[in-house]
Amino acid sequence: MTHWIAGEWVQGQGEAFTSLSPYNQEVIWQGNGATAEQVNQAVSAAREAFVDWKKRPFAEREAIVLAFAEKVKENSEKIAEVIAKETGKPIWETRTEAAAMAGKIAISIRAYHDRTGEATREAAGNQIVLRHRPLGVMAVFGPYNFPGHLPNGHIVPALLAGNTVVFKPSEQTPWTGELAMKLWEEVGLPKGVINLVQGAKETGIALADAKGIDGVLFTGSANTGHVLHRQFAGQPGKMLALEMGGNNPMVISDNYGDLDATVYTIIQSAFISAGQRCTCARRLYIPFGDKGDAVITKLVEATRNIRVDRPFAEPAPFMGPQISVAAAKFILDAQANLQSLGGESLIEAKAGEAAFVSPGIIDVTNIAELPDEEYFGPLLQVVRYEGLEKAVELANDTRFGLSAGLVSTDDQEWEYFVDHIRAGIVNRNRQLTGASGDAPFGGPGASGNLRPSAYYAADYCAYPMASMEGQETVLPATLSPGVSL
């Protein structure tokens, strides 16, 4: 059974689809997608469940969420293995994701109290009380690169605030979504509070269009997110939270300090998860001159030595494959396009078996107008520059604004960088791909419109209600003109 609707597992009635393991192309999951009618059934179930769920004391909702966290901990190795099989990421990496699924729940609970509690103050003779109320039914769209903890980062805050959920995982990772839903089932979640619908584009469109949806929480590609944004132009009654990708710049100063540490930071920023993190460095700005040359020489050498292999291989690999053969082809096509524009490959990304692509580095300094696209994979573009001001100017030449970084030991350079860079997440001497659940996650421009994270997700899962309250009725000393009593 593929879908969880109104507390029951049901078979999909739409088109058949499969999940292929990206490292060997074996079928590891198969089912039928949800039809528009089944999506509407899921939304109706969530709508009905919302009436009771929002009335429950917070302590009851919290208890169910905490029970789910314990289930995740008990099944963490199984979760890690399923994610590794579906995404191809090394098992050491998917274990960290399984841990994050449970670990960030504590942050979400704290955020509920900090950001959606009640507050009272006096103003102009009125007692002003600020309360927060749930939006209603939330549609959660999960990404394939972190199919466990990223959807969880939307679902948990939504439930804590009193919302109900219809969850659509990525069509690339249906198994992970199904496993998570079974854990919610085991902790006794009331029927209809979460509903799972699987499928591809048609299922997603039906969910976003459903009349009973009050808000959409989306994590995924900019292209899909922008389609949703246009789709919502005629639906002003729905809240839309988008967290999309980035064309993220990483600037290396002449004052970078330790060479090995600098190169390691670059590799972690560009190639972890096979480049399939939205915060990965896409463009690397390196100064002209001997110090910059040293970085490139060391980086090329270290990149050639990156171990790329299947997720359970020994010794452990640093990188696995792309999520699909199509995704691998996209990276190779992007490389070919940059080469045709005048880019010079320092290391050429090459296709391997199934969806494997080796990491590539290409010098694009001589390309007058770089394509402003997110190449979601292990393809790093190098741009040489003179002067930090020029580097920041080049780094800001993008429609995205998710993450950016500077490697520099000079405090004044850092102050200039943070004052002038356009990005929502900025790092100094740290990898771009690190993120804290306590910090806002997102950026301006084409990278999204809100800042989802374990902590800040509370902001868009409940709306503020302001009430001006008096203990008794009071007749003012002066009545408004034209009124007599």
Curated annotation (Swiss-Prot):
GO molecular function, one term: succinylglutamate-semialdehyde dehydrogenase activity
Enzyme nomenclature, EC number: 1.2.1.71
Pathway noted in the entry: Amino-acid degradation; L-arginine degradation via AST pathway; L-glutamate and succinate from L-arginine: step 4/5
Example of a GO biological process term: arginine catabolic process to succinate
Keyword terms, alphabetized: Arginine metabolism, NAD, Oxidoreductase
Binding locations of NAD(+): 220-225
Listed PROSITE patterns: ALDEHYDE_DEHYDR_CYS, ALDEHYDE_DEHYDR_GLU
Catalysed reaction, written as an equation: N-succinyl-L-glutamate 5-semialdehyde + NAD(+) + H2O = N-succinyl-L-glutamate + NADH + 2 H(+)
Active site: 243, 278
SUPFAM superfamilies named among the record's database cross-references: ALDH-like
Class of this enzyme: oxidoreductase
Keyword NAD assigned: yes
InterPro entries assigned to the protein according to its UniProt record, in alphabetical order: Ald_DH/histidinol_DH, Ald_DH_C, Ald_DH_CS_CYS, Ald_DH_CS_GLU, Ald_DH_N, Aldehyde_DH_dom, SuccinylGlu_semiald_DH_AstD
Function according to Swiss-Prot or TrEMBL: Catalyzes the NAD-dependent reduction of succinylglutamate semialdehyde into succinylglutamate.
PANTHER family linked: ALDEHYDE DEHYDROGENASE-RELATED
Family of this protein: Belongs to the aldehyde dehydrogenase family. AstD subfamily.
Name of this protein: N-succinylglutamate 5-semialdehyde dehydrogenase
Organism: Vibrio campbellii (strain ATCC BAA-1116)
